[in-house]
Amino acid sequence: MEAIDELSQLSDSMRQAASLLADEDPDETSSSRRPATSLNVVALGNVGAGKSAVLNSLIGHPVLPTGENGATRAPIIIDLSREESLSSKAIILQIDNKNQQVSASALRHSLQDRLSKGASGRGRDEIYLKLRTSTAPPLKLIDLPGLDQRIVDDSMIGEHAQHNDAILLVVVPASQASEISSSRALKIAKEYDPESTRTVGIISKIDQAAENPKSLAAVQALLSNQGPPKTTDIPWVALIGQSVSIASAQSGGSENSLETAWRAESESLKSILTGAPQSKLGRIALVDTLASQIRSRMKLRLPNILTGLQGKSQIVQDELARLGEQLVSSAEGTRAIALELCREFEDKFLLHLAGGEGSGWKVVASFEGNFPNRIKKLPLDRHFDLNNVKRIVLEADGYQPYLISPEKGLRSLIKTVLELAKDPARLCVDEVHRVLVDIVSASANATPGLGRYPPFKREVVAIASAALDGFKNEAKKMVVALVDMERAFVPPQHFIRLVQRRMERQRREEELKGRSSKKGQDAEQSLLNRATSPQPDGPSSTGGSLKSLRDKLMPQDKDKDKEKETPEVSGLKTAGPEGEITAGYLMKKSAKTNGWSRRWFVLNEKTGKLGYTKKQEERNFRGTVTLEECSIEEISDDEGEKSKSSKDKKSNGPDSKGPGLVFKITCRVPYKTVLKAHNALVLKAESMVDKNEWINKLQKVIQARGGQVGSASMRQSLSEGSLDKMVRKPVDPEEELRWMSQEVRGYVEAVLNSLAANVPKAVVLCQVEKSKEDMLNQLYSSISAIGNERIESLIQEDQNVKRRRDRYQKQSSLLSKLTRQLSIHDNRAAAASSWSDNSGTESSPRTNGGSSGEDWMNAFNAAASGPDSLKRYGSGGHSRRYSDPAQNGEDSSGSGGSSRRTTPNRLPPAPPQSGSSYRY
């Protein structure tokens, strides 16, 4: 009975869980309306099989009419509930939530009268009774009319038997046990429960078949699981069926009359069925069998229900998190909620801004795309046109004529051009401001708490937008100040370098002029020496001796003359379909050691890049130079060698340095590097031919990509005659002014590049970082300045939201309770089932294998032989053929079973103490 009580609690929990999973109101009144079929017991049998007597035995009171005049003519449903405080004789009838104490005889006569009145008609109205006693298990008993009556059809049976959890009680009288295979009740049970997982067989009226050996043999075969194949998977229980009536008739006011009757019933059954398992005899065995079947059915449903509850719990928690906490009905609570919502909004804002969600990537896109493009599109060509530069310089009030010192005009030009950078900077600030405003709107929409209070959401967006406007104004002031800073102060060193470079140009021109005149003098002296030297007439001539003496004294000059007479060949290699790739060795000056390293250089004219490797066989460049923003100029060997150590000079010798083999590659933008971290790349060719070819090709690439070439290298590429003409020309004022404008443009471009790098930093500082740090403070200060009435008007919760929150809170509480209860019941039910299966191995229909049809017929033949053969089924002459496997020393698990259901591999707890705990 205790097991039934636990199953009743489990059934109630499962009913509430089903209501929750069906999204019904978790209130007990509404969930109780959902029918629970796990504790339903449907009695199936023919007229006179003893169905009502068996149900009376379960109730503990003769409530249902029995006998010929009490045949069931309509379905009778008795909903039982157990109350231990009642006496064993008390019966409480519940009608419309009202309790009325009645007697068993009064209920029986009332039911008999109703059945008699309805016998004339063909009505199928059910009779429903709700009883509360201390003797009955909490089950719902359904007594159907006899299956052989005309009023019984498939729809009436299916209405109650089709539920997956309803227990089917197949009632067969002992006198018809030998004909069990043809029982209609068994066929119907097999139709609705093919695996017999919710079927219990009852053999009633054992006392009436005590004198029929054949019937007793068939009963013992069924109880010993040796019946026909269709009965071996059904647990069978034997009952007398009249124990309750006998106890009621013989009761003399004792509370133990029912227990006495049930013990008497068990003793009578033991004396009649001497070879049957004792665990299958009597009313107590019936209750245990019902509990086992109900537990098995519930165990199948529990995992799915628990899984559904876990998923439902997650859904409920997500909804509660989305709906938020309940609003506190006070001024302080309302203000606290407002500040907490500001905190939630700020978290979402930072997530969108710093985490890259939403439109955060547009800030970086503005810095890397739109703003640099606007800087590059500034009309520098128009401002640095020679005519415009000349006009500005002429209009400026310089200290000296502009050809000598046009400093003031050039300063004015620099300020005018840098003024153009203010508009792109302001546009960059406006773009970032629009992005931040979009992020504010997206963050407000993504904040769950603000969604519940639309007026407060609009207020938060307005406060945040006003704060962003202030940050935007500060950022505009900052970027304009950056531009004005560059405009206001042009370093004097820039103009000093202009003069220095002009003087350097003049010095180089003088050097080139001196070199050309020296070459002419050397050529004239060589011709004079050849003309004055005598021809060698013989070996003893004086001229010959003088020539030989000169050859001995000047062997090196002779070798040099031979080298001059032999034309040099370039060592560079070309490749590609159009010869666009040039490769060869160059000496690269190291910045660390100040020494020269021989490297393999490769120039790609299509890509405009110069790369080098340590060896010719290497495939990956150690460094590359982009020639687009570079300039090339020739430097003297003295400048290239001045950083060499004296040790290197001694090792190379006095004549190791070649004449004019060094040139330098630099970047037109002062703060940029050419190669790795170096601002200049100093190279030295192996010969003058290689140098000229390298310089010509590098100049070609640089000029094709908009670069500029140093003046020295340009003059070096000209012929000597044209160079002399250029040196002898007077200074061209326009050429000088053009050169100065180019220098000033280089400075302006460097400043613009610097602004392109620094303006985004100012924008990030004044707008992005400022909004990260001060957004919450702005919200807090603005909300704190609002009055209580204004805040309460802004934070008004929707009533629908409030009702939904209350509903989900109830569901959450009930879900946690049901999950805990069902988990405990699942473990207990599994443990109890495992213990029951282990302890009842001898009598369990699923542990013993089903007997064949031949064994079934032998049992009838032995019963028909006479009393001597029947003794073999008693306790003294127990037959080994039909005896229990445990008594034969056989392993019950090894017998050939038909459909054995294994129990879970879980260790059960210690079994409960049996004895007086079964009061009923």
From Swiss-Prot:
Top-level taxon in the UniProt lineage: Eukaryota
Region annotation (Disordered) ranges: 507-577, 632-657, 828-920
GO molecular function, one term: GTPase activity
Annotated GTP binding sites: 45-53, 204-210, 246-249
Keyword Calcium annotated: no
Region entry G5 motif, spans: 238-241
Gene3D superfamilies reported in the protein's UniProt record: Dynamin, middle domain, P-loop containing nucleotide triphosphate hydrolases, Pleckstrin-homology domain (PH domain)/Phosphotyrosine-binding domain (PTB)
Catalysed reaction, written as an equation: GTP + H2O = GDP + phosphate + H(+)
Chain positions covered by the region annotation Important for homodimerization: 747-761
Residues of the PH domain: 579-703
One of the Pfam families matching this protein, by short name: Dynamin_M
Disulphide-bonded residues: none
Residues recorded as bearing N-acetylmethionine in the entry: M1
CDD domains reported for this sequence: DLP_1 (cd08771)
Protein family according to the UniProt entry: Belongs to the TRAFAC class dynamin-like GTPase superfamily. Dynamin/Fzo/YdjA family.
Name recorded for this polypeptide: Dynamin-2B
Gene name of the encoded protein: DRP2B
